[in-house]
């Protein structure tokens, strides 16, 4: 997706918040399955909507004071350990160039970040503990942090989650075109399955064929595939996908 689309969204969200405001949005955290193995990463939908960044350990900060608007992305500093195990982490210059964001700093530099003491805070309420930790690191008004911690600072707390979700309900021409592309890929994958599936196959084989078509067209699954044959088709969110397809069954 082109950067101009994300910039339009950021401009739109900042126009919807009050003046003298600080908006903070956190990326989704990585989820560990066991030991050092994580589940496949899934970015926060709202964070991705405003940035296009699909990496963990990133934070978007926007401030609004009259006509003065500032946008900062906080990212992880590249290191040799990540380079060996997961591949090179992008540098702040790479983020700045790729996503066209005004300022980019590393997470170990946040104590140097000056955001003032805005009277209105916008964030997703589910991230409150992350927020308190960040505000203390960036020397934001400690009284605000204390009130937030004790849940008494209601007048300046604004839920960013609902605000961004409302924005996402209305699709731009660019988004509508992307949705059509995704629908066309899905149609092609479904037609392919109608031609190829037969009794004796396993549901997971059908799933593999479906995913193969989607990935070959540059697509990703919006949710786990539901491949349900026979009585499994009565289960609304069936995802085991491990039964054999039998004759005369749907």
Predicted regions and their residues:
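A composition/biophysics-driven feature that prefers long, compositionally simple stretches
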Residues: 1-188
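Short, glycine- and charge-enriched coil/turn segments that flank and shape catalytic ligand pockets
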Residues: 19, 198-201
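Short catalytic-site patches enriched in acidic/histidine residues
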Residues: 35-41, 140-146, 158-163, 170, ...
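Generic, well-ordered alpha-helical scaffold segments in large soluble proteins
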Residues: 182, 189-192, 196, 209, ...
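Residue-level marker of positions within ordered structural domains that often coincide
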Residues: 65, 184, 191, 215, ...
């Amino acid at each position: 997706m082109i950067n101009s689309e994300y910039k339009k969204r950021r401009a739109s969200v900042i126009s919807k918040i009050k003046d003298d405001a600080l908006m903070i949005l956190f990326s989704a955290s990585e989820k560990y399955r066991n030991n050092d193995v994580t589940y496949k990463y899934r970015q926060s939908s709202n964070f991705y909507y405003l940035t296009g960044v699909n990496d963990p350990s990133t934070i978007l900060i926007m401030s609004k004071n009259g006509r003065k608007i500032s946008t900062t992305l906080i990212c992880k500093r590249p290191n040799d350990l990540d380079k060996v195990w997961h591949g090179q982490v992008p540098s702040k210059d790479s983020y700045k160039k790729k996503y066209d964001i005004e300022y980019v700093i590393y997470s170990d530099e946040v104590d140097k970040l000056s955001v003032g003491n805005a009277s209105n805070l916008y964030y997703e309420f589910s991230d409150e503990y992350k927020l308190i930790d960040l505000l203390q690191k960036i020397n934001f008004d400690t009284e605000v942090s204390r009130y937030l911690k004790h849940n008494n600072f209601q007048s300046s707390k604004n839920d960013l989650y609902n605000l961004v979700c409302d924005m996402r309900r209305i699709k731009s021409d660019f988004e509508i075109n992307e949705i059509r592309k995704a629908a066309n890929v899905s149609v092609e994958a479904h037609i392919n399955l109608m031609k190829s599936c037969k009794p004796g196959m396993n549901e997971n084989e059908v799933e593999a064929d479906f995913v193969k078509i989607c990935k070959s067209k540059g697509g990703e699954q919006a949710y786990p595939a539901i491949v349900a044959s026979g009585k499994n088709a009565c289960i609304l969110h069936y995802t085991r996908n491990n039964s054999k397809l039998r004759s005369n069954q749907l």
